[in-house]
Amino acid sequence: MKEVIAIIRPNTVSKTVKALDVVGFPAVTMAECFGRGKQKGYFSANLPEIVDIQKIIEEGEKEGRFIKYIPKRLISIVVDDADVPLVVGIISKVNRTGSFGDGRIFVLPVEEAIRVRTGETGEIAIGN
């Protein structure tokens, strides 16, 4: 089993989750997060529109601050090893614009999974 963690733009979460669901991966965990990459928090006019991001930039500029961290979303999904290329491919396809800020995907090993409700373990517990 592997955990696929994706850090993506907030405005692509719905499309990403829907695309994963369509191919049989409905179970995901999501969290709000903030970060920055090579662009170091600077925004470009050619980046896709992100909800409320312009307001955040304007407030930061008024106060003489630069944007240290950009709002992102973290999606985590645990899948069988054989499903990793499919899941990574879907996340990449939905989120790739070719611009800074498209995100990152990490693939980590999972030693064990336990479904608390039933006590099931291993691949049965992830239910994909």
Curated annotation (Swiss-Prot):
This is Nitrogen fixation nifHD region GlnB-like protein 2. Keywords: Nitrogen fixation, Transcription, Transcription regulation. The keyword Transcription applies. Could be involved in the regulation of nitrogen fixation. The keyword Transcription regulation applies. It holds the Pfam family P-II. It comes from the Archaea. InterPro entries: N-reg_PII, N-reg_PII-like_a/b, N-reg_PII/ATP_PRibTrfase_C, N-reg_PII_CS. One of its GO terms (cellular component) is cytosol. SMART domains: P-II. GO terms for biological process: nitrogen fixation; regulation of nitrogen utilization.
